[in-house]
């Protein structure tokens, strides 16, 4: 089974490596075109006795304030909140979201509520980092979970103290349009790289002619709006984002020792190195032996004699030689000949890197 898995990995790595071109819109985005995080404090009502306990004070204060704003005078000492839970509401405001646009919201309990499933989120203002209200949220909470219990047993599915309000947020304040009336745009790469940024600038200049784009650093490409697209920024962005480039990446090997996962980039190369692999199994068994004197002996005594059994089993090791400039597919094939497991391969790759024979960055997660 292990050899089959490694053979599959080798087959995938030794397939013809084609220069895969991707759209610019998939590897970069314009400066300012991003989501903005919103947050708010609210109440979930209508719970079936699974809300906050009386020991949690802020739900009582919040509920009293809500009732007073509605003209209902209450004594805070008489309020119980078993059917109410104080929650934090979060959401992401998409770029170019217009007034009246619906967005999803996340609801998370703040107190000691057992479950907010089936409750209703009361109208909650959602603020941005600048303190302004950009949306309001309200609606039924969906948790896809439950929590039931008795005196001797309980049952729970998923996480009943956090849920979603699908389309529960309503945008009230729009973000400014960062693309309108701008003669210069900055394109930010999701993964900064000198080569990729240069290729993007070259592709844009070939398509629109002239010095439209220039890579200012590995993470940004500055673009001047062509004269033919004056007043038509959206059309220019649409035409530019459809262009395809071949992104470049630094050679990297990612190892996860907890799960045995290995991810190896296509650009990884190995210098000439010899690899030996062997398995050593040590088996130790203690079997104490009791020695008793002969019957009716007056001088003898019962003693315990230790007896240790040791077995050493060393698997058949081997020596594999990896040639100069070998690709990662060739490395896997050489190591496969030694019969290594994925976890053994992690140790071997780390040893190759320590020997200075791997021209790649090794990241352990």
UniProtKB/Swiss-Prot annotation:
Gene Ontology BP terms: bacterial-type flagellum-dependent cell motility
Record-annotated membrane-spanning stretches: none
InterPro entries given in the database record: Flag_FlgI
Function: Assembles around the rod to form the L-ring and probably protects the motor/basal body from shearing forces during rotation.
UniProt protein name: Flagellar P-ring protein
HAMAP family recorded: FlgI (MF_00416)
Signal peptide: 1-21
Alphabetical UniProt keywords: Bacterial flagellum, Periplasm, Signal
Intracellular or extracellular location(s): Periplasm; Bacterial flagellum basal body
A single GO molecular function term of this UniProt record: structural molecule activity
Pfam families: FlgI (PF02119)
GO CC, any one term: outer membrane-bounded periplasmic space
Similarity-based family: Belongs to the FlgI family.
Quaternary organization: The basal body constitutes a major portion of the flagellar organelle and consists of four rings (L,P,S, and M) mounted on a central rod.
